[in-house]
Amino acid sequence: MGIGNAIVIGGGIGGLAAAAALSRRGMAVTLLEQAPAITEVGAGLQISPNGLAVLRAMGLDAKLTERAAVRGQAVVLQDHKAGARVARLDLMRGQGAYPYVFVHRADLVDILLGAAKRGNVTVELGAEVAEVTPGATPQLRLSNGSRRRAELIVDASGIHSRARAVLNGADQAKFTGQVAWRAVVRNDFNHPDEAHVTMGPGRHLVSYPLRGGRLVNLVAVEERDSWAAEGWNHADDPANLRKAFADFGGRAAAMINAVEACTLWGLHLHPVAQTWHQGGVVLLGDAAHPTLPFLAQGANMALEDAWVLADSVLNHPAEQALARYQNLRQPRVTRVVKAAAGNAARYHLRPGPLRSAAHLGLKLGSTLAPWAMVGAFNWLYHHDVTAPK
C-alpha cells in the first residue's frame, strides 16, 4: 500500500522541491520551516542540465525565464593578475534540450514555493523541529512541545539535520582549510553571460550574471588555517575580502571593490551519510550529502533527490521505495562530492612549473579539443533522473 501523507522538514530548495514533487503525485504534504518566513539571502545558483531536467519535468522551466534567469554560454578560466584567459568551455555544445542557467536563489525558492502551494502543500512557519523519531509511524517533536506524525518524514533541513544524527550518529565534518565569501553586486562591468573562474595562488573568484544580467554573483574562496563557521549568513566586513584578494586585477578587482555587503563561511567536508532512511524517516539534499561549492551541484543534487524520492514512493511500497531511493542516489552523490572536493586544488595552484604546465594544458585542451573537455562532465550534466527507466 502506498504512502498517503508526508511531513517535509525544511523550506529550502530541497525541501520545497520534495514537497512539490510529492504533492503533485497526490500525497498530502505538510512542510515545516523554522524561520518566520520562507526567504533567501541574496545569492546566485548555477542550475546545470541535470537540475533543469527536474524543473522541466515539474513544469517549472518557463518560470525561470519569467524571472530573467541567465542562460550560461560558457565557463571561462582565467588568471588572477589581469584576467588573461586560460581556457573557455562552451556550455552550448551538446546540451540538447536543457540549457545551463544562472538564477537568483531567492527566485528559485519562490518558484518552488509556488509549485508547492499549487499542490496544496500546507506550509507551517516558525515550526522548529527538536526531535525526530523513526518507527512504524514516524513522529517528530517541535520546540514548543507539540508532536506530529506522518507515514513519511522527509528531513531536508541541511547540514544540521536532526534526522541525520539519529540515523548516522554524530557528524564527522572536517574543516577544509578554506573559507568563502558571497556577495552580489550590480553588473557595471559588462560581465558576459558566462561563469568566470579567476584563479590565483591559494584563492579563486567565481562570478556570473543574474536577473537578466543586471547583477553579478560573486563567490570568493581563500585558503587559510583559521576556522570559520558553516552557513552563509555570517556577515563580514568587505574590507577583509578586498585585503585577501588585493593582488587580483582586471574585472575581478573591480567587482571585488564594488562589494558593499558580504557573508563569510567556512568550508567543511562532510561524509555522505551511510544510512539515508529508517522507520519512515528519510534524508534529502544536504542532510544526506553536503557538498563543497566547487562543482556548483548542491541545488542540482537536491532537485534530483526530490524527483527520485517522489518517483520511488509513487511506484513502490514504502520501505522498498526508500531503499530504492538511497540505492539510486548514494553512488551518484558520492561521486559528485568527491569531484567537488578535488576542484579547489586545481584552482589554487601556486606560481611555479606545476601551475604553468596546468594552465598550458587547459589552454591547449580548450583550443584543440574543446569537445573533450566539456565531454568530461557528461556523466554529470547528461544524467536525467526524469527519463523513463
Regions found by a protein language model. Name each.
Residues G231-T263, A318, Q326:
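Flavin-binding catalytic cores
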Residues G11-R24, A28, L32-A35, V154-D155, ...:
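Conserved mid-domain beta->alpha element of the FAD-binding
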Residues E33-P36, D90-G96, E223-W227, A306, ...:
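Short glycine/proline- and charge-enriched loop/turn segments
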Residues A62, G83, N187-P192, G213, ...:
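Short helix-loop capping/hinge motifs at secondary-structure junctions, enriched
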Residues M1-G4, E66, A82, L295-A296, ...:
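C-terminal helical "tail/cap" subdomain of flavin- and related membrane-associated enzymes
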Residues N5, A28, R214-L218:
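Residues at the starts of beta-strands that form the adenosine-phosphate
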Residues A195-A228, P238-N240, F245-A246, G250:
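Active-site substrate-recognition segment that forms the wall
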Residues G2-A6, S23, S48-V184, D225-R242, ...:
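Conserved N-terminal helical subregion
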